[in-house]
Amino acid sequence: ALVEIKTPKSYSENARIGLRLFEAKCADCHGSNAVGQAGVAPPLIHIIYEPNHHGDESFQRAVALGVRAHHWKFGNMPAVAGLTRAEVKSIIAYVRELQRHNGIF
């Protein structure tokens, strides 16, 4: 873990769906609960990813197209196959609830 976080006692229904999808599709790189992994991928529970800097559409584009490294030195993120926009929206809901619970916004 690259950051220490607190997890909420409960999530909205959409965020619960997002949590399951995140653990299946994102956690291998970004770590369980989006805390990042040294040498692999950054934490998403970080001020860099707050909604005014990386809006929801930025997450949609990153999943669909991949993204060139620009804030961290982890290398480029590849596109993630097998997720619909609606599923990514649920993942975003999960990440945003974690961010909010940890004072990111």
Region annotations inferred by a language model:
Residues A15, L19, G31-A64, A79-G82:
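Gly/Gly-Pro-rich "capping" loops immediately C-terminal to redox-active cysteine motifs
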Residues A38-I45, L65-L98, G103-F105:
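Axial heme c-ligation environment in periplasmic c-type cytochrome domains
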Residues G18, F22-S32, M77, I91-V95:
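The canonical Cys-X-X-Cys-His
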Residues I5-S10, A24-C26, G39-P42:
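Short acidic/polar alpha-helix capping motifs at helix-coil junctions
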Residues A1-L21:
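Electrostatic cytochrome c docking/interface patches
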